[in-house]
């Protein structure tokens, strides 16, 4: 919250920019501190990014409020509540260093997905069965890695006690991108590999 007056006011954008930098600093620290074998490029697993910044109601009016929305990734070994605490402490440190923010502390809300990380061993039979099926179809070994983003597999693994693998066609980099698409040959490969894995796993042959 700021004050919507020009030279004598408090521009919410200026205060919001401090929060943006605080989030960037937290991201850098998490990049330095966290590692996981399924994420060789750990930066892809740990987004800590202000994705939306909304302030003001009119072009010539000093904004007195700013709303920031952040995308925050967690590693499989992390607890979401602990990561939320890290964010809260980081924002609090920045607010304490600014007289206005100290008197008017930012309000934090953690909502939307709030997804825990989840994993199963790469040695698990379901992983190896699907990997073998993929190799039979393509003639090459699959790359076994973690992925970033909310997925329902966490419910099956952590609450349903059901080992689960994410597998499908296309490139992860193309997901949710402009002109998102999946090549037909990728779809054929994925479908065939899944069919072979099901046959093997269920002992149908």
Show the residue positions of the predicted features:
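Metal-dependent amide/peptide-bond hydrolase catalytic core
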Residues: 1-205
């Amino acid at each position: 919250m700021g004050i919507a007056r020009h030279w004598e006011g408090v521009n919410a954008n200026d205060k919001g920019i401090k929060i943006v930098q605080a989030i960037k600093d937290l991201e850098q620290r998490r990049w330095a501190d966290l590692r996981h074998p399924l994420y060789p490029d750990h930066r892809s697993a740990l987004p800590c990014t202000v994705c939306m910044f909304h302030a003001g109601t009119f072009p010539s009016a000093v904004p007195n409020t700013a709303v920031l929305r952040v995308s925050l990734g967690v590693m499989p070994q992390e607890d979401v509540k602990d990561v939320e605490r890290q964010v809260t402490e980081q924002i609090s440190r920045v607010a304490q260093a600014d007289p206005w923010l100290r008197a008017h502390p930012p309000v934090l809300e953690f909502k939307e997905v709030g997804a825990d990380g989840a994993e199963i061993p790469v040695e698990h039979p379901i992983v190896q069965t699907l990997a073998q099926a993929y190799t039979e179809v393509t003639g090459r070994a699959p790359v076994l890695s973690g992925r970033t983003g909310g997925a329902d597999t966490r419910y099956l693994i952590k609450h349903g006690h059901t080992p689960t693998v994410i597998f499908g066609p296309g490139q992860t980099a193309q997901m949710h991108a402009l002109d998102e698409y999946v090549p037909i040959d990728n779809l054929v490969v994925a479908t065939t590999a899944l069919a072979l894995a099901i046959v093997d796993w269920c002992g149908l042959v």
